[in-house]
UniProtKB/Swiss-Prot annotation:
Gene Ontology biological process terms from the UniProt entry: regulation of DNA-templated transcription
Subcellular location: Cytoplasm
Family: Belongs to the TACO1 family.
One GO MF term attached to the UniProt entry: DNA binding
Pfam families with a match to the protein in the record: TACO1_YebC_N, Transcrip_reg
Name recorded for this polypeptide: Probable transcriptional regulatory protein CKO_01097
Region (Disordered): 1-20
Organism, scientific name: Citrobacter koseri (strain ATCC BAA-895 / CDC 4225-83 / SGSC4696)
Length: 246
């Protein structure tokens, strides 16, 4: 949506996401286990694990649950025998789409992802077909806040950029490995974020109209319903006017 942060866009779809909360928790736990398996159980020394912990807490997962998942990864749980796979493709209206998966069966995963693209008027691309349009960043989001205060604290903590949106939301962008450190510094300054996550930020946007926007939303929903899909990133831009018709 034009003039809104990624977090605001996420909240726009919150009702649908709440219905998927069980599946979301399962995916977060899988990422916690895998991150701990690959990089150790200390979030301060393992940026991927720290990002997973931040995401778990942003989704109201209890400390007990996430600590058990980390312990499973450190202990070599079978769920840790997963590999990260990134699929790239084109969605409705020529949108660039990246699909991050954790899978123990590439054939199963690619079949599910390809099916979602084909059902929604898109197509799966080759490696590198759209990746050049995205940059991996940490995104720390505030629904409201004083821009000058947040900007000063964020830049002092090592953030790369601070963006204010039309609805008053503020996003702080960081190198993805530094997101946890910057978030800690902001909290130490009395600035508690509403969300923190590692994301793929597009360098260009594709405007969605009343015809293509519903198709893009359907593609995102179908992909997120796949058990192996962890995250879906895209460069579709949906205006407030079009969003009101969805």
């Amino acid at each position: 949506m034009a003039g809104h942060s990624k977090w605001a866009n996420t909240r726009h779809r919150k009702a649908a996401q709440d219905a998927k909360r069980g599946k979301i928790f399962t995916k977060i736990i899988r990422e916690l286990v895998t991150a701990a398996k690959l990089g150790g159980g200390d979030p301060d020394a393992n940026p991927r694990l720290r990002a997973a912990v931040d995401k778990a807490l942003s989704n109201n997962m209890t400390r007990d649950t996430l600590n058990r998942a980390i312990a499973r990864g450190v202990g070599g749980d079978d769920d840790a025998n997963m590999e990260t796979i990134i699929y790239e493709g084109y969605g409705p209206g020529g949108t660039a789409v990246m699909v991050e998966c954790l899978s123990d069966n590439r054939n199963r995963t690619v079949a599910e992802v390809r099916h979602a693209f084909s059902k929604c008027g898109g197509n799966l691309g080759t490696d590198g077909s759209v990746a050049y349009l995205f940059s991996k960043k940490g995104v720390i989001s505030f629904e409201q806040g004083d821009e000058d205060t947040i900007m000063e604290a964020a830049l002092e903590a090592g953030a790369e950029d601070v963006v204010t949106f039309d609805d008053g939301a503020i996003d702080v962008y960081t190198a993805w490995e530094e997101m946890g450190k910057v978030r800690d510094a902001l909290e130490a300054a009395g600035l508690k974020a509403d969300n923190a996550e590692v994301s793929m930020i597009p360098s260009t946007k594709a405007d969605m109209d009343a015809e293509t926007a519903p198709k893009l939303m359907r593609l995102i929903d179908m992909l997120e319903d796949c058990d192996d899909v962890q995250e879906v990133y895209h460069n579709g831009e949906i205006s407030d006017e079009v969003a009101a018709t969805l």
